[in-house]
């Protein structure tokens, strides 16, 4: 049978022809639908189906309610009546589908046989609307080229000599090559980002320019248009580095390789820890720009927080167990005070050093009469305890030498005690002559961790503020912090360098408790850069020692601490954007003070803390500091 409208002649029965006319031509036979009417479920139809089931052949007898039926092709299918109707309609509809004579694609009717567009290669942008290719005009407006199909292959039948009959063959994947290359994008008045031929749209080809004045000195010249973006980047990616005026408006000339290497050291593994001064770190100070030097120095002193916390936890457990063991052996009660750069948060390197003071838990008094500045005598306070009587002279003063020897013996017994298992990981170190500390090396027992240098210092705690000390009122910390700082002081055993009457009874006044409180909370009122400048000065000191290890010996961090506390009082503001200028001023004043041989004690101004530093060493330090400011370091 054939259709008298489209002359199609592949219909096997009238039912298929009727469906074709209804679907394609919209002609429906009167009183006949495109699909056969569904049987109503009545008693008659139910009886008929039951009879058909009973007479069904044996292979399908097990399928209750199913019959042997044939589709229009004569194929037998054991389906229900409803399934037969659906299956028949689907088969007839499939047979009515048109095929393209060239491409073989299927369509529902002749009207749908139209040229198909080829797939867009992966990664390429698809046009918003299926319009024809564009061409540029003088006004740079995109216009249509009439008569050209919008596809990957822009050839026309006339140009190729082949008539495709309105259908274009598929273009191989990735072979999209227009005859005329596209015109590259050009910048507009709005300064939009542009694209050059062959450059993916996703690539940002901008280079640092005058329109992006904020450039990161660590990320190979990454630029930022706004200062807020730049500051946010420095806080998130490089939290320990200076920002603002340090890197503003300066491109990375990629010559400072040490700067990038020092930053990589921070992100390296915890086990691969650099020493206080890396082997090639001193060479990095040949940078001509002082601001870049600040960035290098700050990046080099950043320490991983996880490593710091782990070390402190181990040391706190060790000291707690040691104190418990010592109190079990000693005939007088002891307490501990934790000091050092770990606890005031000014540590700058991986050379782990801890200082702990052990003092008797009893009332003691200090006498300052006939004592040089910074020294005092100690005697037992009003108490019934006689635990310290063996270490007193006939006048009732505590003899430093006797007390020191007793404490050193107590350290030795406690560390070798069988109940103190951590003592097996310690090794006694030889102390310098006149040093008040019992020095040990403590192995944490962690792979890759170096042994920790621990100073156990015998001391005496006095619950008052020393009379020779001035009344401090720093306006850069809160009043409560000042009150805590001036609540007490300590006395340690350090020999007075000159001949003095009763010199063997002198104790060195230690303001470790006050120093820790002030330095730890230096930024509590103004979230500024006080502690950052102190850390940078400590780094400068370490670099100077590495460059002149044989000539710089006496100058230490304690001298810097006394200088910085006074510097904090003199300068009113310490905002982060002032860091570089304040550091320059601090270096200049420090060089002058060292050259003149005078750094007064912050708490006792009459006490010169660098009196023991030789003139030759002081001259060399002043020379190094001047060279740093001049860019010749």
From Swiss-Prot:
Residues 23-80, 107-214, 250-276 are annotated as: Disordered. It comes from the Eukaryota. Gene3D superfamilies: 1.10.1410.40, 3.30.460.90. Keywords: ATP-binding, DNA-binding, Immunity, Innate immunity, Magnesium, Manganese, Metal-binding, Nucleotide-binding, Nucleotidyltransferase, Transferase. Mg(2+) binds at residues 353, 355, 455. Its cofactor is Mg(2+); Mn(2+). It catalyses: UTP + ATP = 2',3'-cUAMP + 2 diphosphate. GO terms for biological process: innate immune response. Residues 68-80 have a biased composition (Polar residues). Residues 29-67, 125-143, 176-194, 250-274 have a biased composition (Basic and acidic residues). The keyword Nucleotide-binding applies. Its EC number is 2.7.7.-. GO terms for molecular function: ATP binding; double-stranded DNA binding; metal ion binding; nucleotidyltransferase activity. It holds the Pfam family Mab-21. Belongs to the mab-21 family. Nucleotidyltransferase that catalyzes the formation of cyclic UMP-AMP (2',3'-cUAMP) from ATP and UTP and plays a key role in innate immunity. Acts as a key sensor of double-stranded DNA (dsDNA), the presence of dsDNA in the cytoplasm being a danger signal that triggers the immune responses. Directly binds dsDNA, activating the nucleotidyltransferase activity, leading to synthesis of 2',3'-cUAMP, a second messenger that binds to and activates Sting, thereby triggering the immune response via activation of the NF-kappa-B transcription factor. This is Cyclic GMP-AMP synthase-like receptor 1. It comes from Crassostrea virginica (Eastern oyster).
């Amino acid at each position: 049978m054939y259709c008298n409208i489209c002359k199609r002649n592949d219909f096997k029965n009238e039912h298929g022809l009727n469906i074709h006319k209804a679907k394609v031509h919209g002609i429906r036979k009167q009183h006949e639908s495109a699909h056969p009417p569904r049987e109503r479920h009545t008693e008659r139809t139910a009886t008929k189906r039951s009879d058909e089931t009973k007479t069904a052949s044996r292979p399908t007898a097990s399928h209750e309610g199913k019959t042997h039926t044939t589709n229009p092709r004569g194929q037998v299918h054991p389906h229900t009546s409803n399934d037969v109707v659906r299956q028949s309609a689907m088969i007839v509809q499939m047979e009515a589908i048109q095929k393209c004579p060239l491409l073989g694609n299927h369509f529902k009717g002749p009207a749908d046989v139209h040229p198909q567009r080829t797939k867009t290669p992966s990664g390429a942008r698809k046009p918003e609307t299926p319009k024809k290719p564009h061409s540029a005009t003088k006004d740079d407006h995109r216009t249509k080229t009439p008569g050209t199909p919008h596809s990957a292959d822009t050839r026309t039948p006339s140009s190729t000599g082949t008539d495709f009959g309105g259908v274009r063959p598929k273009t191989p994947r990735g072979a999209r090559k227009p005859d005329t290359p596209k015109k590259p994008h050009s910048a507009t008045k709005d300064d939009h980002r542009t694209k050059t031929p062959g450059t993916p749209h996703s690539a940002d080809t901008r280079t640092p320019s005058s329109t992006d004045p904020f450039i990161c000195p660590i990320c190979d010249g990454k630029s930022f248009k706004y200062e807020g973006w730049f500051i946010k980047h420095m806080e998130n990616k490089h939290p320990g580095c200076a920002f603002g005026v340090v890197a503003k408006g300066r491109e990375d000339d990629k010559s400072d390789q040490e700067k990038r290497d020092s930053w990589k050291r921070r992100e390296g593994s915890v086990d691969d820890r650099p020493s206080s001064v890396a082997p090639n770190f001193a060479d990095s100070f040949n940078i001509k720009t002082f601001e870049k030097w600040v960035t290098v120095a700050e990046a080099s002193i950043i320490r991983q927080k996880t490593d710091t916390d782990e070390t402190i936890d181990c040391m706190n457990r060790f000291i707690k167990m040691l104190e418990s063991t010592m109190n079990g052996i000693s005939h007088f009660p002891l307490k501990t005070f934790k000091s050092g750069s770990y606890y005031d948060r000014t540590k700058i390197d991986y050379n782990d050093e801890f200082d702990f003071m052990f003092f008797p838990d009893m009332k003691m008094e200090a006498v300052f009469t006939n004592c040089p500045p910074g020294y005092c005598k100690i005697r037992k306070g009003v108490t019934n305890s006689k635990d310290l009587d063996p270490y007193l002279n006939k006048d009732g003063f505590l003899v430093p030498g006797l007390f020191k020897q007793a404490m050193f013996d107590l350290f030795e017994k406690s560390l070798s005690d069988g109940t103190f298992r951590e003592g097996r990981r310690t090794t006694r170190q030889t102390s310098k002559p006149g040093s008040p500390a019992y020095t040990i090396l403590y192995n944490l027992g962690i792979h890759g961790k170096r042994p920790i240098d621990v100073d156990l210092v015998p001391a005496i705690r006095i619950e008052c503020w020393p009379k020779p000390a001035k009344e401090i009122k720093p306006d850069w910390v809160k009043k409560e912090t000042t009150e805590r700082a001036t609540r007490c002081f300590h006395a340690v055993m350090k020999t007075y360098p000159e001949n003095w009457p009763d010199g063997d009874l002198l104790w060195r006044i230690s303001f470790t408790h006050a120093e820790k409180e002030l330095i730890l909370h230096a930024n509590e009122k103004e979230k500024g850069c006080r502690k950052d400048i102190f850390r940078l000065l400590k780094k400068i000191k370490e670099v100077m020692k590495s460059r002149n290890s044989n000539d710089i010996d006496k100058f230490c961090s304690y001298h810097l601490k006394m200088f910085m506390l006074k510097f904090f009082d003199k300068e009113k503001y310490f905002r982060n954007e002032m860091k570089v200028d304040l550091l320059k001023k601090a270096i200049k004043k420090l060089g002058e003070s060292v050259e003149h041989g005078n750094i007064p004690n912050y708490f006792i101004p009459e006490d010169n803390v660098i009196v023991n530093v030789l003139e030759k060493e002081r001259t060399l330090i002043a020379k190094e500091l001047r060279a740093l400011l001049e860019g010749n370091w």
